[in-house]
Regions:
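Divalent-metal coordination cores built from histidine and acidic residues
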Residues: 1-88, 149-152
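Active-site microenvironment of metallo-dependent hydrolases
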Residues: 170-186, 190-356
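Short acidic, glycine/serine/threonine-rich loops at helix termini
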Residues: 6-8, 33-39, 70-74, 98-102, ...
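Structural motif
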Residues: 20-25, 56-60, 85-87, 107-109, ...
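Active-site-adjacent C-terminal substructures of enzyme catalytic domains
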Residues: 98, 104, 108-209, 224-230
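Divalent metal-binding pocket/active-site signature
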Residues: 61-116, 133, 137
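Divalent metal-coordination and catalytic microenvironments
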Residues: 11, 59, 122, 162, ...
């Protein structure tokens, strides 16, 4: 979203010699929607050079669902370019008709299902469902509970985290945590391990080389002390113990200087964060605990007066949220109100240019 092809090239270079299989999907929606001010815009022609890279497996989560469903030309060119590779989805809250159109476009998977009913609809349309259990979004319990209650097949289900904080990985584990929790909820352990391994690699188009211990497969495997508790003894990559490999010195690619100088904010001042309110009932971004999806609500919000002008006043229930254009020096700032963040007398200012 900030550096375009230079950013993609940097990620590919940085992960070339890692002690693990790091594959890259090319971002499909830069910007995520037409309403955003991005550092760059990526078109299909900008993605062509990555098609022959063996570590580029396809097109990353297609989140502009409206462009897919309506057949918008630029989006169709991207989907056509990657039609012989894997195409990841990002499709929350679509109705049955739109979900069918979305699947018809060639999108192979989705990780945004947060109910068992929605996951079933995606599976019925031939899609893989990556059950997400991360730091913010936790969907595993709802989906796995439905699978267990209905004694449903797990063949089109896999695991992902979709943003899990380092401290949570250290405390809980990563995909290992998903396996453990799924077994505890009643899924057959063999099926849980298949969801984490061979079914995932089959979905991404690598099911004939990784994801199983069998002739012709890479010797990437985990040795366990306890099968059901997923208590890990050691990890092997390319047949070698990773713990021993970590002791060796390795060359790490340097970050190009121009990628370090990307935060450019023009004429920013406190006044740009003032949120003027004409009516006390105001549209608000409402957060949903345990989910990354939000909803629009209209509620009466706290106000104060500034020279007889009504302005929003944050409190323990309602916080102020702002988007500051940070790449092209446009000076654009958008302010709004958000509910459920639970911050008082503090501020957070991340520069990450995540998706929408």
């Amino acid at each position: 979203n900030v550096s375009g092809n230079d950013g993609i090239d940097y990620i590919l270079n940085q992960t070339e010699k890692t002690l693990g299989n790091v594959f890259v999907m090319i971002p499909s929606c830069v910007p995520a929607t037409s309403f955003e001010d991005n550092g760059v815009i990526l078109y299909a022609k900008d993605m062509e050079k990555y098609l022959k890279n063996p570590r580029v497996l396809g097109l990353a989560e297609v989140m502009d669902t409206r462009s897919v469903i309506t057949g918008e030309e630029s989006m169709m060119k991207k989907l056509d370019l990657f039609k012989d590779k894997n195409i990841d989805g990002h499709a929350p809250l679509l109705n049955d008709y739109d979900l069918s159109a979305y699947a018809l476009s060639g999108v192979r998977s989705d990780h945004e299902a947060y109910t068992n009913q929605y996951a079933k609809k995606e599976v019925e349309r031939g899609m893989y469902v990556f059950i997400r259990e991360g730091s913010a979004a936790k969907n595993l319990e709802a989906i796995v509970k439905g699978i267990v209650n209905e004694n449903a097949s797990t063949e089109r289900y896999c695991f992902c985290t979709d943003d899990k904080h380092i401290e949570d990985i250290i405390l809980e584990g990563h995909i290992s945590y998903n396996i453990r929790k799924t077994i505890e909820m009643g899924i057959n352990p063999i099926k849980a391990y298949k969801m984490a391994t061979i079914q995932s690699t089959q979905c991404i188009g690598k099911g004939k080389s990784i994801g199983a211990i069998a002739p012709g497969y890479k010797a990437d495997f985990v040795v366990l002390n306890d099968f059901e508790k997923v208590d890990i003894n050691s990890v092997y990559f390319n047949g070698e113990n990773v713990e021993k490999l970590l002791e060796l010195e390795r060359e790490i690619a340097a970050c190009p200087e121009h990628l370090k100088q990307t935060v450019k904010v023009k004429d920013f001042n406190r006044d740009k964060l003032i949120l003027k309110v004409k009516k006390e009932k105001f549209p608000i971004v409402n957060t949903i605990p345990g989910e990354v999806v939000t909803e629009k609500i209209v509620e009466e919000i706290p106000i104060e007066y500034n020279n007889e002008e009504k302005i929003f006043k944050a409190n323990e229930i309602y916080n102020k949220i702002a988007v500051v254009e940070r790449k092209n020096n446009t000076g654009k700032v958008g302010a709004g109100a958000i509910k459920g963040f639970g911050i008082t007398n503090d501020a957070i200012a991340p520069t990450v240019a995540h998706d929408s």
